[in-house]
Each structure stands twice: as C-alpha cells, then as structure tokens.
C-alpha cells in the first residue's frame, strides 16, 4: 500500500491521519506551523484563547468519534444562568417573547433548501420573530445577515447548537489545544509520521489529502474553482478584572453579535481574578473592520459595566473566509467543492462537500477523504460510497 500524505495538521488533517492509520495505511502528515491544530490551537498561558468562539456539540457524530477513541479531554458544561439578550437597545435576561414562541412553533419542521431562512420562517411565525431568530445565529455563521442563508442550512445548527435542551455545547478544559494534543497522541501511537514547520509549495505524490484552508488548497492545487461563501467577522479577545454580575453569554438580537465569558465555565483559561472574554461582530458589506469593532465595543459597553477600565489584555482578529461554509438558498453541502479531486487527490476541511454543523464538516470530510485515500493507496481505486454521518 502506498503511503498517504496529508497536508495540514488541523482538526481535519489529524482526523484524516488517525482514520487512515486505523485502516492500516502508512501516513505522513505535514504542517506548516510549529504546532498542530490549525484554527483549533489555543494560545499558551496566561490567556488560553481560541481562534474565535469554539464549542463541541455533545449531540454530534464528531463527539461520539472522539469518545470512542478516548480523545475527549475533561470538559465543562455551559452555566445554566448568566445568559443575556440585546434587544431594542437594551440588555435583557429573557429573549424576545415572539422569538421564543417562534422557535417552539418551528420545532419538528423540515426547513427547505430552496428558500432563505427569513422567507421560510416568516411564513410560519411572522416576519419579526423570524428576523429575531435569524439574528441569534451570528455565532453560528459569522455572517451579517443569517436570514438570507438557506433555511435548511441555518435551521439545523440553530436547533442543535442554540435551541437544544439541555444545552449541547461543551468546552474542553484548558482550551481546544487539549483536544489537539490527544489527537496528536493517538496519531503518533498509530505510527503516523508528523512533520511540523514544513511548508508545502508543490502537491505531493498521490495519494494525498489536502486538509488546509480552502484558499491554501486553491493555491496548492492550482484550482480556481475551490471557492465557497464563508463568514466575515471581527473578534475581540479580552481579559478583564473580575466583577460580580458579569454575564456568561450575550446574544445580540439586533446586530448578530455575540459575547462569551469563557472563564464562567473554565476558570483555568485566565489568571485568578481575571475573566477571559471573546466577542465577535460580523462585518457588513462595505464596512471596515474598525467600524465593526466600534459596534462590538458598544455591545460590550451595554453588557459589561466598566470593562474598559478593567481590561488587562486584548487581541483583535479579523476572520474572513475562515469560519466554515455558508450555504445560500438552492445550495447544500453537496454543492461545495468535492472531497474527491481525482487522480488520488482528496480534500478535507470545513468548507467542502460534507454534512454536519461547524467542526463536524471538517471531521466528516476527513473521514470520507481517508476512506478514499486508503482505497487508492491499496490500488482499489474508488470505494463504494459510505456516508460519514447522516444529515
């Protein structure tokens, strides 16, 4: 069996490496950075912050896959209190009543691929409630107008990520690097050769799995068709001195922003007496990151009293095309760039043709790519289709 080369050591690359090695393949993984993890890397202490808001969903196949391999680190559940909502220029403890009722009325319905979420939801619960529901999805899309996305695309993560009871979100203690380290250990135990600090400028010999960001894959493969819609958002990572009464989460039902105080569930992420906050605001078309940052800071002003005077550390990031796939009406995950690129080249990542929500897309595409690559390496060509997960 030929050796499989994997380019990229993020969640998709590590999943592909583990899955390929479990099938008996010889695997070599190449990562350009000094550390594995990609966008799942956490910064080192004293402030262990992820690249944008991250959470695992305990109702996901990715969660089950990690658990079956003992790759789930200790994790925290979200607090049951401390959620606030920004609505009509006020910070509230309860959401807009219409939106809450709308969510209950929509439960159990199958959202269509052909319609945008705003049109579909409005036909069942009215325009105002539909708009409020759509704006709650800023954290899931990093998009300035979630309501224009496909109803089928938006409704599933809304139900699973925000409307499930009890909440399905889980937070790895110590940040996402805890997951990355366990996956690295599993790969090494399976005999995967890992080379970090190795930048790839030419496509390696097939079979190869390209598990990079889509823009990097486009350059490496020389294939300009490798594009898809993604989010555009500014993210502020802040450390502030503790103050009693700070909320855990702020859901912005006006401008699709989001604030999360991660130390509410995992105090180890910041030094004692400090809180680690991540806040994000989607950037509107034609808007600068500076203007979006100002809007985000106004949200912080409303929700975290005196945060500017309490600030001890700050990092600003602009995430453009790096937050996963977004599907417009009449498009589904099947229309995204295909995993199988032909001639023993396969693609994995969170913007390719694989089902799931958020990080599940990277995982499911990597599992599919590994099956195809192992079959190619063994000289069997293309295997019969096997569904990685159901949608």
Task: Explain the meaning of each model-derived region.
Residues 262, 268-391:
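Conserved flavin/dinucleotide-binding core of flavoenzymes
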Residues 45-131, 135-136:
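Dinucleotide-binding Rossmann-like beta1-alpha1 core, especially the glycine-rich loop
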Residues 23, 198-289, 336, 387-391:
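Mid-domain catalytic core of redox enzymes
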Residues 2-29:
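N-terminal Rossmann-like FAD-binding beta1-loop-alpha1 element of flavoenzymes
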Residues 12, 35, 215:
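Conserved Rossmann-like nucleotide-cofactor binding loop
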Residues 105-207:
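Active-site/ligand-binding neighborhood in enzyme catalytic cores
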Residues 4, 25-27, 208-211, 309-316:
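Hydrophobic anchor at the start of a short beta-strand
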């Amino acid at each position: 069996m030929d050796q499989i080369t994997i380019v990229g050591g993020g969640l998709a690359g590590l999943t592909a490496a583990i899955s390929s090695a479990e099938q008996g393949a010889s695997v070599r993984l190449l990562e350009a950075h000094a550390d594995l993890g990609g966008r799942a890397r956490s910064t080192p202490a004293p402030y262990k912050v992820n690249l944008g808001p991250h959470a695992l969903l305990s109702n996901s196949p990715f969660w089950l896959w990690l658990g079956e391999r003992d790759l789930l680190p200790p994790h925290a559940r979200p607090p049951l209190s401390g959620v606030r909502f920004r609505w009509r220029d006020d910070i509230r403890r309860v959401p807009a009543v219409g939106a809450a009722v709308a969510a209950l009325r929509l439960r159990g319905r199958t959202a269509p691929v052909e319609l945008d979420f705003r049109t579909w939801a409005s036909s069942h619960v009215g325009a105002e409630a539909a708009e409020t529901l759509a704006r709650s999805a800023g954290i899931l899309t990093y998009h300035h107008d979630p309501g224009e996305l496909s109803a089928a695309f938006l409704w599933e993560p809304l139900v699973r990520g925000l409307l499930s009871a009890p909440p399905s979100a889980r937070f790895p203690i110590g940040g996402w690097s805890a997951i990355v380290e366990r996956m690295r250990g599993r790969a090494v135990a399976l005999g995967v050769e890992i080379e970090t600090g190795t930048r790839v400028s030419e496509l390696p010999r097939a079979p190869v799995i390209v598990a990079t960001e889509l823009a990097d894959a486009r350059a490496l493969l020389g294939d300009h068709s490798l594009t898809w819609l993604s989010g555009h958002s500014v993210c502020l990572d802040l450390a502030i001195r503790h103050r009693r009464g700070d909320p855990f989460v702020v859901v912005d039902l006006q401008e699709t922003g989001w604030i999360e105080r991660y130390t509410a569930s995992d105090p180890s992420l910041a030094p004692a007496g400090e809180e680690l906050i991540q806040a994000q605001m989607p950037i509107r078309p034609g808007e600068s990151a500076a203007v979006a940052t100002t809007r985000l800071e106004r949200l912080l002003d409303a929700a975290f009293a005196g945060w500017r005077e309490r600030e001890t550390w700050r990092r600003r990031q602009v995430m453009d095309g790096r937050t996963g796939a977004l599907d417009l009406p009449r498009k589904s995950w099947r229309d995204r760039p295909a995993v199988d690129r032909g001639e023993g080249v396969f693609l994995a990542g969170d913007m390719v043709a694989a089902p799931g929500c958020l990080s599940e897309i990277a995982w499911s595409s990597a599992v599919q790519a590994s099956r195809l690559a192992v079959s190619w390496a063994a000289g069997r060509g293309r295997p019969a289709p096997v569904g990685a997960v159901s949608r």
